[in-house]
Amino acid sequence: MVIWLIGLSGSGKSTLANKIVLEANELGNKTVLLDGDVIREIFGDDLGHSLEDRFKNAERICQLGKFLDNQGINVVTAILSLFPESREWNRNNIKNYYEVYIKTPLDDLIKRDSKGLYEKFNKGKISDVAGMDIEFIEPTNADIVIDNSDSIESFLNHAKPIIEKLIHSQ
């Protein structure tokens, strides 16, 4: 199964993904994490953050997800997933695909800003920031939408039903 976590920077994708992967593995379900930032590093940081490069990175992650799923390995991705066509490709090509959109108000993202992206953008130091000068098209067909404007504890409670879905997909 491929669990596809979608959201802007700071939405909690990696936090939720890490919890799902840890707990699924503890329950004996081999599950791997594909994090958009880590995939960039693995491939030698050969891509920038332009739309074209972001699309190439998304294609890599889609293909890796399918490759691992075809071998019976559960996959949890943490990715911006800017492109509706990538999500559609996943639905059409990955047999056990489950899309999760982590919806977080922009004000909360700016407050969290663990990578400093929004601050740098607002100071004019960087560009190509999804949700700011790069349009983020919200998913319209997500299997579940999680509102992450509440506490971290409340947010992480969403891991359990996702793990159950992953376990029962086998």
Regions found by a protein language model. Name each.
Residues 2:
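Walker A (P-loop) ATP-phosphate-binding motif of ABC ATPase nucleotide-binding domains
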Residues 13:
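Conserved lysine of the Walker
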Residues 17-63:
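Conserved substrate/cofactor phosphate-moiety recognition/catalytic segment
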Residues 9:
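The conserved Walker
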Residues 30, 70-78, 98:
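Loop/turn-to-beta-strand initiation segments
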Residues 103, 111-170:
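Small-molecule kinase domains that catalyze NTP-dependent phosphoryl transfer to phosphate-bearing small molecules
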Residues 77-79, 90-112, 146:
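Conserved phosphate-donor/acceptor-positioning beta-strand/loop module used by diverse small-molecule
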Residues 5:
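Hydrophobic anchor at the beta1->P-loop junction of P-loop NTPases
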